[in-house]
Amino acid sequence: MTKQIMPITLSYEPAAACWGEKALISSSEQGVMVHLVGKGKLGAVQRAGRKIDGQGIRHVALVGEGWDLEKSWAFWQGFRAPKGNRSIEWPQLPAAEKQELESRIKIIDWVRDTINMSAEELGPEQLAKRAIDLMCGMACESVSYRIIKGEDLREQGYTGIHTVGRGSSRDPILLALDYNPTGNPQAPVFACLVGKGVTFDTGGYSLKQSSFMDSMKSDMGGAATLTGALALAISRGLKQRVKLFLCIADNMVSGNAFKLGDVIHYRNGKSVEVMNTDAEGRLVLADGLIDASKEKAKLIIDAATLTGAAKTAVGNDYHSVLSFDDKLADDLLTAAASENELFWRLPLAEFHRSQLPSNFADLNNVAASPHTAGASTAAAFLSHFVEEYQKGWIHIDCSATYRKSAVEHWSAGATGYGVRSIANLLLAKAK
């Protein structure tokens, strides 16, 4: 059976009146036309891609004038979906733009595919392997790594990852990946990336309701996003040494799972009382941040699907940014704007660091009433594990990583959002 390919063209004129006053697309024997009138043209192209896919059209060609890199990418973002096969015949682009488009497709599609995998398919070991495979596919000669898993984590002092992950039949893992293109094993580490990789989150004994648990295969979105960001930065020419720490575990209920009231003792001397096992992401990230701080890198970025509070604040369209470093926060917002991604800064102040009191440890893993700024106190908790937290450290609460249902510009599932912005920031800081 011959594959039917639908031509897609762009127009800057409104559709004919018969299509409706606000019609985004119209069709004829020549194919489908996308009508770009008013502001927000990239968003309109992405919505058109989603609408065309919704009509069951799976094979298209972007033809005619106006299809530059960003419009082509916007169309793919909307057109792509987790089920079924799709193909696009791309427009002719300059060589550099073609290479960038191919890199985005390879890497950000990897991020989306990885996050969309079921928890049965993607456990801690599988996530670590996928990250290694992607990075080796980008620059294998410059990549080395070590994996610490299971009881070795406890013996080597990675108490947060071990505590959260010990309740699962699948061993928790720390993946420490070193991208060093300099050829010098003594080269300084320019940046450290620390990602939350909870491959399924039941909430532990602070058990989630089904309506909150059903998307928790995506709770490793921070780890996937940072892996993709490093890969994209490499494809764009990053030549500085970067270390990636993925803190990977299942948060399950079992006779061996951690419990409310347990106290975790970390390598940096901090002790943490667990008063909510569903605030587990910060417990695993703490181990990665301790390692990152030891590297004395000038830039530390952590990313995690950390709090519902951030999503309540900014919705599903923005990632949240929290940092004590105003310049660094501004730099990330600038990077995001240049990559056509939406980030929003949430407050983080010194007083948030004291809103985690415990009667039995240095810190509580959740803030006590009346301290209700959940995203801010979660970031404040993390700051206790960053040596120089006031400068060079930024926390991204990944509110836009995953959608439980389709909207007008995204299919259901992972978005790959944030990969471009973080890659942009890495390159800007590496200059």
UniProtKB/Swiss-Prot annotation:
Keywords: Aminopeptidase, Cytoplasm, Hydrolase, Manganese, Metal-binding, Protease. SUPFAM superfamilies: Zn-dependent exopeptidases. InterPro entries: Leucine_aapep/pepB, M17_PepB-like_N, Pept_M17_PepB, Peptidase_M17_C. Mn(2+) 1 binds at residues 201, 278, 280. NCBIfam families: PRK05015.1. Homohexamer. This is Peptidase B.
